[in-house]
Amino acid sequence: MFTRAATLAAFTIACALSQTPAANHDLGFEDTPMLPGLPYHVHDDRRPHPALVTPSDVPGGPPSDAIVLFNGKDLSAWTAHHSDITRGGGSGTAPEWKLENGYAESVPHTGDIATKEKFGDCQLHVEWAAPPEIQGASQSRGNSGIIFQGRYEVQVLDSYNNPTYADGQAAAIYGQWPPLVNAARKPGEWQTYDIVFEAPKFEGGKLVKPAFLTVFWNGILIHNRKESMGPTQYRQVAHYSEQPAEDSLVLQNHNSKVRFRNIWIRRLTGYDQPEK
């Protein structure tokens, strides 16, 4: 038989329970199945949240986490580079390229330029233009290159009504893979490359993961995570050899007056990075 005191205690407990907030499932769960190969449940409330990145206010502009390599003012992020020094890196001397009207233009016979910083996996945005005056043909017309880690080249070339070998035209992974389509603009018009580069991985001197490239040319996908056969070679088959995990980005000087502007890069990391 309930006493008055027992009844009052039960009422008090019931009121307290009714005021306990329910689990907020909008923020996640811990009673759902585990994701295969991961230490997290489906919709896990303990999973790290992605870092916040602020997009640019203008199309093609650098987001808040980008490293601006060229802003139209100077080449302070670059050094002169000659291929007889190393595949990556530079000479330590200032580039001799021309700066004008917000762009950098390669000056024939002054060598390539290489970034002072070194990079592994990355996202690159670069805008370029072949010379407006048509000179030469095939590989002699507006030739340059974007060379990741000083080894893996995406070709720059005036490919507007300019026949050449397919794996050497603009946006080719040079000597290996032609682009899926030719998205070339006319000579002198600005063009864009947006490239995701995945660096190769080595363990004990052996290749365990090749390099991959995803390339958008003027907004059009022309390489979809395409595997590189190895460092770029001319008239040879590429082969991998052990290399540093990070190395410089190189802009090639092929003795054509190619222009570049608005160059920025983002270091890429994996999923589930610790929150800062």
State what each model feature region is.
Residues 6-7, 69:
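Hydrophobic alpha-helical segments
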Residues 19-276:
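Carbohydrate-interacting regions of secretory-pathway proteins
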Residues 1-5:
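Positively charged n-region of N-terminal signal peptides that target proteins for export
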Residues 7-16:
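Bacterial N-terminal signal peptides
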